[in-house]
Structures are given as C-alpha cells and as structure tokens.
C-alpha cells in the first residue's frame, strides 16, 4: 500500500514538472478568457487534464479566467477547479463515481452514494481546506454558471448565484441528472434534468470564449464505457494536458480535438452543438408531456399504458447495453 502511494506521489510530481515546463513554452501573457465546458459523463477525467494546465497558466499570469459555463459532469469539475481541489476529483471522487456505477450496474448513484460523495466534498472544503461558506461562495458566485432543465416549467435554466454550499450541490445534482442513468429515476426531485449543453456567453464582451468539447469523435465512446478505466485514467489526463498545450502553443489559431474559441467555431462544430441543444429541448418537452400531462387519469388509459411500456422497454434495453458493453 505504501509502495502504491509513493508511486502515485511520484507520478503527481512528474506531471506537475511536465506541466510547468510546457507552460514555460507558451508565449502569451495576461490573456483574459471565459471557459465553456461541455458535458461528457465519465469524460470529465479528460477535462481534469485541461484544467491542470489552465491552473498552471493562471499561476504564471499567462491567462486570467473570469467565468466558467458548465453543464452535467463539467459543473462538478469546475467547482473543484475554482476551489483548488482538482486532485480530489482525480484521486477520490472520480473513482468513487466509477465504483458506484460498477456496483449498481444500471445507474451511477443510489441515494446513499450521492450523499457520500457530497459529504466528502463538504468535509474537504471545510475541514481540510479550512474554507468558510462565505469564502466558497466568493470563489463561485458569478464565476460558475451551471445549466439545467426545469421540466415542470419546460425551461432551460442558467444559474450563476448561489445562496449556500448546499445550493451549489443541489444545482450540480440538477445539472448532472441524466434520466435513469445518474440515479434510478426519471427526474431529480421529480422536476430537474441534465443541462446537456453549456450556456454560451452573450453580449459584446471582448474576452475570448474557449470551448472545451468532451464529446469529440475520438472520445464519445469513453463517456460511458468504463472497461479498464484504471489503466486509462492517467492517459486521459495526459491527453487533456497535451490538447490544452497544443492549442495555446499555436496561439489558439487552430482548433484541437478539445479546444476551440467560440469565435472560430466551424460549421461542423456549430451543427453538433445546436443539434444537441435542439435534442435537449425536445426531450424536455417529451418529459413535460409525460410527467405533467399524460399522467393525468382523465387521459386515454391505452395511450398511457403504451407510453409506459415503451419507456420500460427502452430503459431495460439500455440497462442491458450498459451491463454487457460498458462495465
């Protein structure tokens, strides 16, 4: 056990040295940025690599990050970035999430699992980091933008101001809830669903908006396939570091597999973003009709029965896919 811990510590030091040397090769200074982080389920581990690199860039005043727009898993990671706890996500939280998924087989979190994860985060922020709630909110408010759907209002919500740490946690849970996958229920608190796509900042702000895409063609499979995940975690983190380095080494002039300025978005990237955006709204409307309309007893019982049977069939088929292909 001690040997494994020493090896991990050695790898961490090597990675820090690697990142520091790479950042020294970047010839930019005080570049003001807003980050837009896509969702991507278990691909969040790639994002950790990117953010390790950005953290070093910020520490050397090469970039200044003002706001981070997120949805789904990226809201988790962004909270760790803003509170300087990326290592906690890499070494503990991510592995807890993967272990829960493998144990539950059909969904990621039981009620007990999700309580354990957020208790760990809370304990780290308060007891290990010594932060007060006021200090946490100061780091997060108007900097962390989280997108989710309110199905009852059939509305996409972007939240940027939080009343408490509990409010931050609840917003992340809303944004990360993929029906029947995150937890064994259709909607979080019978009302909320994954945001699917992060909010793109609007207005005439002169800051560059850097989009980090976790759902590229080379990564789409990794968002849910977890076989041999332990062997690949460090590879994915290094991949994220290298992608961010490649982007800034070329002065952001060329799109990489993950990084692209919104102002330089190509046709294919725009189509992908807005296709998923449109799909999320269609899913929102469908769930609204099912939960708040078709469930009313006065409607034709055969229509209700058909919809329920169809949903159950799709859910079971997807569970079998997860169990035999992903885990």
Q: Model regions: which residues?
A:
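Patatin-like phospholipase
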Residues: 2-68, 79-327
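Gly/Ala-rich beta-loop-alpha elbow adjacent to hydrolase catalytic centers
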Residues: 70, 74
């Amino acid at each position: 056990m001690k040997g494994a811990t020493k090896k991990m510590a050695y790898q961490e030091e090597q990675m820090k040295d690697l990142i520091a040397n790479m950042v020294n090769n970047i010839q930019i200074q005080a570049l003001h940025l807003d980050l837009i982080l896509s969702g991507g389920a278990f691909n969040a581990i790639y994002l950790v690599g990117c953010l390790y690199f950005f953290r070093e860039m910020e520490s050397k005043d090469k970039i200044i990050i003002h706001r981070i727009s997120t949805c789904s898993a990226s809201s988790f990671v962004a909270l760790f970035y803003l509170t300087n706890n990326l290592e906690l996500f890499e070494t503990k939280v991510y592995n807890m999430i993967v272990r829960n998924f493998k144990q539950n087989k059909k969904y990621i979190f039981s009620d007990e699992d999700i309580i354990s994860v957020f208790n760990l985060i809370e304990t780290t922020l308060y007891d290990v980091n010594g932060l007060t709630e006021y200090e946490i909110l100061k780091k997060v408010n108007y900097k962390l933008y989280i997108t989710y759907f309110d199905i009852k209002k059939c509305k996409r919500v972007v939240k940027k101001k939080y009343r408490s740490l509990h409010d931050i946690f609840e917003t992340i849970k809303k944004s990360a809830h993929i029906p029947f996958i995150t937890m064994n229920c259709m909607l979080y608190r019978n009302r909320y669903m994954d945001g699917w796509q992060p909010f793109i900042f609007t207005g005439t702000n002169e800051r560059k908006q850097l989009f980090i895409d976790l759902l590229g063609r080379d990564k789409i499979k990794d968002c849910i396939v977890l076989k041999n995940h332990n062997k690949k975690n460090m590879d994915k983190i290094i991949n994220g570091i290298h992608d961010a380095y490649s982007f800034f080494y070329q002065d952001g002039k060329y799109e990489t597999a993950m990084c692209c300025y919104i102002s330089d978005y190509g046709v294919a990237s725009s189509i992908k973003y807005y296709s998923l955006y449109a799909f999320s709204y269609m899913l929102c409307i469908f769930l609204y009709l099912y939960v708040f309309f078709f469930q009313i007893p006065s409607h034709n019982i055969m229509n209700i029965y058909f919809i329920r049977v169809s949903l159950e069939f799709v859910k079971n088929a997807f569970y079998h896919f997860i169990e035999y292909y992903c885990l």
